[in-house]
Amino acid sequence: VVIYDKNDKILNTGNGFFVTEDGVALSDYSLFKGAERAVIINSEGKQMPVDAVLGANDMYDVIKFRVAITEKKVPALTVATVAPAVGAEAYLLPYSTQKDRTCTQGKVKKVTKIEDNYSYYTLDMRLKDKMVSCPVADANGQVFGLAQKASGQDTASICYAAGAAFAMSQGISALSLGDITLRNIGIKKGLPDTEEQALVYLYVASSQVSQEEYVSLLDDFVKQFPNSPDGYLRRASTFVFGGKEDADFDKAAADMERALKVAKKKDDVYYNISKQIYNYQLGKPEKTYKDWTYEKALDYVHSALAIDSLPVYVQLEGDILFAKQDYPAALACYGKVNRSNLASPATFFNAAKTMEMMDADPKEIVIMMDSCIARCPQPVAVADAPYVLERAQMNMNAEQYRAAMLDYDTYFNAVSGQVNDVFYYYREQAAIKARQYQRALDDIAKAIELNPKELTYRAEQAVVNLRVGRYEEALKALDEALAVDPKYAEAYRIMGICQIQMKKQEEACASFAKAKELGDTNVDELIKKHCK
C-alpha cells in the first residue's frame, strides 16, 4: 500500500491484503493516518486506487477499505470464523513479487478477548520490519490476524496479530462523520451497510461536507442501493439547488424519472418531485427549465393525492396554489390540513396569511390566528414568538388595540426582552391607540434611547406629549429632532400645531411657513385654517 499526503508526496508504504474478491482489504490504521489518497500494488505489480475507507480502529490499529479494482475480481484470502487456540500453528504470508515466497512459521502463544468477543493474538514468531499488516493464517490457510510489531526486548522472539475478524467488523455508522479516527484520513469514507443508516449519514453529511463531496456520497448511495428512490431524489435535489445550466436540470429530471421507476410507494416520489419543482419556481429562475412551472408541480402533487390523500400532500397543494395567487383554493387546502392530524401553529398561520391576501374581515383573521397561538406550548416560547408578533399586527388591523398591546407584551416576555427600537415603536403605536399614554411615552423614549438618530421616533414623542397636553415636552422633543436634522419639515409642522394649542398664533404660522418651505405638503390646510 502506498500512501500520499496533501501535496501528493509519498507519506508511507506498508502492507495489506484482500479479504473479498470485489476489493475489500485490510491493513493498519497508522499507515493511513494523514492520507489524502492511496494506491495498492499487487504481487504482479499492478496499481489500483483505494476508493473508500470502510471503517477503522486506532486502538488496535486496523483499517478496512475498498479498492477500485481494475479486474472483475481479485484473489482474496478467507477470514477464519473460528479463532485458533493457544499452541496452534501460525503462518505469516509476506508480500512478494517472487513466485518462491516463503512463509514465516510460528505458534499462537496467547489469545486475548477484545471488543464483542473478538480476539487479539500474541505469537511466538519474529517479525521483520516490512512484514507489518501481512496476513497471519492458520493451518487451513484461513487468515486470523494482521501482523503487528512487538516493542522493546520482545521483538526478537514474539509479535502480535490484531484479529482479522475484528478488522472486518469495523464499519461506518450514521454518526461516523464526527469520528476523529476517520477524520484523520482524507480519503473518502464509504457509506453504512444498511439503507436506513446510510440515509442518516447522508443527512448529517449534507451540512458538514462540500457540495462536491456530498454529490460523490450520493453517487455511492445510488450504486449501493440502486432500488432506493431516496438516493435519486436527494441527488436530483442537489442538482436543482445548485443548478445553473440545463445540463444540471437534465440530470435532476433523469434522477426523478429513475426514482419513479424504482419506487414501490409512487405517491411519495410524486410529492417529492412536486416539492422540488415548486421550490425551483420559488427561486424565480430567469428562464424556466422545460415545463417546470407551478402548474407542473400541481400536476405531480395531484398524482400523489390520487394515490393517497395525506395531509402533507394537501399542504403542498395549498402552498403551490398560494404561490399561484389562487388564494380561495389555497385556503380550502389549508382548511383541510387544519382539520387533520397535521394541524399545527404553522398551518393555521398559513390560513391566516391567505385570508389577509383575500382582504378578509380583519377580526376573522385574528380568530384564525388565535387558533394558531392556542396550539403553541404555553407560556409562548421564543420559537413561537413570531406568531404573537404577527397577531399583534393583525389586532392593530382589526382596531383591537388593547389586544395588540398585550400581544406585544407576550412577545417581549417570550424573547426575554431581547428587542430593538422598532419593537418599542410598534408597541407605542398600540399603546397610544389603546389610550395608554404613559406606556406610549415610556416606549417611545426607549426607542429613541436605542436609536437616537431616527427622527420619526422624536416626532412621535412630540405627538404623544401633544395628545396629553404636555406642550413644553413636545417642543423639547421637536428641538432635539431639529438638532439632528435642521431640514426635518415634519418637526416644524408639529411644532406649529403645538404652538396653536399654546395660543402662540404668530410663532405657529412661522413654523408652518418653515415646514412648507422645506417641502411638507400636509401643512397647506393648517396654513389656510390658522394663518390669514
Regions found by a protein language model. Give the residues of each.
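Flexible, gly/ser-rich surface segments that form the specificity/activation loops bordering the active-site cleft
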Residues: 73-120, 127-131, 147-159, 170
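C-terminal cap/linker of serine protease catalytic domains
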Residues: 74, 146-217
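Structural marker of alpha-solenoid helical repeat scaffolds
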Residues: 224, 262-263, 306-307, 339-341, ...
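Canonical tetratricopeptide repeat
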Residues: 234, 272, 316, 350, ...
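Register position in tetratricopeptide repeats
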Residues: 241-245, 279-283, 323, 357-358, ...
